[in-house]
Amino acid sequence: MESAKSAAALVEPCQTNSARRLTEDDSLRVSVLSEALPYIQRFSGRRIVIKYGGAAMAHANLQEAVFRDLALLVSVGVEPVVVHGGGPEINQWLERLEIPAKFRDGLRVTDADTMDVVEMVLVGRVNKQIVNGLNQLGAKAVGLSGSDGSLVEARPWGDGSHGLVGDVARVNTDVLEPILAKGYVPVISSVAATVEGCSHNINADTVAGEIAAALEAEKLILLTDTPGILLDRDDPSSLVHQLRLSEARQLIAEGVVAGGMTPKTECCIRALAQGVGAAHIIDGRVPHALLLEVFTDAGIGTMVVGRS
C-alpha cells in the first residue's frame, strides 16, 4: 500500500508539470496566432512576389521551410508569386561540364555555352524541384520561365560585354492573371528571350521586382544570405528594420549600402517607385523567415516603404 502511494506521489507531480507545460505551450500558440490574425486579414487576397534563392535554396531543411511557408500563405488567401535563381547549381553543372564560370561586376558573364547550362538548370531542374515541393504540400504550383508566353521580354544588359546577360524590357501580366485567378502559384525562372527570340540570363532580383511592379503587388520579398540592410556590414546588430524610399537612396549614395546589397536595394527602390506597397530584404538562412516577416509585428529583416 505504501509503495502504491509512493508511486502515485511520483506520478502526480509529473502530470501536474506536464499540464503546466502544455498550458504554457498553448498560450504561446494563441499569442502567435493572435499576432498573425490582423496580418492574415490584411493580406488575404493580396499578391506577394517572393524572390527565392541563396542559402534558402541550397539546404534541404530551409527548402522545406520555404515550401511550407508558401503553402501556408496560399491557405490563408495570399496570392504568392515565386521568382527564383539557382546560381550554386549552375556553378556545379558548369564545373561538371568543364565550362569556366566567369563573373564581372557581380554578374555572370554568359556566353552561348553557359547560357545553355543556365537554361537547362533553371528551367529544367530548379524550377521543377520547386513546383514539385509545393505541389506535395497542397499548394498548386505551375512552373514557368520568363520566355513562356513572352511573360518577360528581355533586352541586352549594358554594353553587351557580359554576353547573354539581360534586363527586363517588359512584363506581360496577361500570362499570370488567369493562373492566379485559378488559385495556382506561378513559379518563374529568371530566363527570358528578346523580341528576336534570343535567350538571356536575367538577375532574379530584377525579374521579381519588375513582376511585382507590373502586378501592383502588395509586397516584394527578397530572400538573401544577409539579415537585411546593415549600417555596419560586419555587425548584424546594426540591422535597419524599416527605411523610407528616400533613406534607402541616401544609404546607397553614402556607400553604406555597397557590394552585393546595392542591386538588391536598387531593385526594391524601383519596385516601390512603380507602386509596390513595400519591399523586404530578409535572411533566407532563418527557417520560416517568410512567415516571420509577413505575419509578426517585429519582422525579421529590412522593410523599405515608399512613404513614412
Swiss-Prot record:
Keywords: Amino-acid biosynthesis, Arginine biosynthesis, ATP-binding, Cytoplasm, Kinase, Nucleotide-binding, Transferase. The keyword Lyase does not apply. Signal peptide: none annotated. It comes from the Bacteria. GO terms for biological process: arginine biosynthetic process via ornithine; L-arginine biosynthetic process. It is an enzyme of class 2 (transferase). The record marks K51, K264 as: Transition state stabilizer. One of its GO terms (cellular component) is cytoplasm. Pathway: Amino-acid biosynthesis; L-arginine biosynthesis; N(2)-acetyl-L-ornithine from L-glutamate: step 2/4. It is found in: Cytoplasm. The keyword Kinase applies. Substrate binds at G86, G87, R108, N201. It catalyses: N-acetyl-L-glutamate + ATP = N-acetyl-L-glutamyl 5-phosphate + ADP. Its EC number is 2.7.2.8. GO terms for molecular function: acetylglutamate kinase activity; ATP binding. Belongs to the acetylglutamate kinase family. ArgB subfamily. Catalyzes the ATP-dependent phosphorylation of N-acetyl-L-glutamate. This is Acetylglutamate kinase. It comes from Prochlorococcus marinus (strain MIT 9303).
